A protein has these predicted regions:
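Interdomain hinge/linker at the junction between the two RecA-like core domains of SF2 helicases
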Residues: 1-35
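A short helix-to-beta-strand connector/capping loop
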Residues: 6-10, 66-69, 96
Length: 216
């Protein structure tokens, strides 16, 4: 649909460096400064809950008590009531300046529309779901949404048994960035199946493998 075409820009500059939470904080603060007059809704998502907590406290320290920005934390520990007390004002535009730090809980079933996103990379499926939380209503005032991807918690070590964490199938691979931009997920799933087939090939004889796929 033309309304949603190019509504979100994916930025990979933070993947070019070994990111630290202090470096990430500086980057977020710079974006906040650029949006000081107009305001912005910023979503920052981590894989690990502890990292989300750590970054929340770093941002709280940086903002101080007098900041006009609302700083909120959302994890799986929150009750439905606590979660809604954060999400409702965001949905209803009560807060013009808000930073929401979260775990991947925001990827599924959370109805919010943010302007700027930061995400620790994991599976490509997760990246696509995250993009769905940014600029959902399309380009605002001529400004598209933007998502900065970074690599902090090394998702391949967390999801060790998930073949989708093979580097060639993540945003560590330039081709997957194109897949994400152009929404060519058929290419992604074909490569996932190819990789799975290779893995099966190591575990079974060639005849057994061909039988496995011919029967599936």
């Amino acid at each position: 649909h033309p309304t949603f075409a190019n509504r979100v820009i994916c930025n990979y500059e933070l993947l070019q460096e070994e990111i630290t939470l202090d470096r990430l904080r500086r980057h977020v603060l710079e974006n906040m400064q650029l949006r000081e007059k107009s305001g912005a809704k910023i979503l920052i998502t981590f894989i690990k809950k502890q990292t989300a907590y750590d970054f929340f406290h770093r941002m709280k320290e940086a903002l101080g008590e007098q900041s006009e920005w609302q700083l909120k934390l959302l994890t799986g520990d929150d009750s439905i009531y606590e979660r809604e007390s954060i999400l409702k004002p965001i949905r209803e535009n009560v807060w013009k300046k808000v930073i929401l730090i979260s775990t991947q809980i925001v990827e599924a079933g959370v109805d919010i529309d943010m302007d700027i996103g930061y995400k620790d990379i994991s599976k490509l499926d997760s990246e696509e779901m995250f993009l769905g939380r940014i600029a959902r209503s399309g380009i605002k005032n001529g400004i598209p949404g933007i998502v900065y991807f970074f690599n902090f918690d090394q998702a391949d070590k967390i999801y060790r048994d998930d073949y989708r964490m093979e580097k060639s199938l993540t945003l560590g691979n330039e081709e997957m960035r194109t897949v994400l931009k152009e929404k060519r997920f058929q290419t992604y799933y074909e490569q996932v199946m190819h990789y799975l087939k290779e893995m099966k090939n190591r575990e079974t004889s060639e005849d057994g493998l061909e039988y496995f796929f011919s029967e599936s």
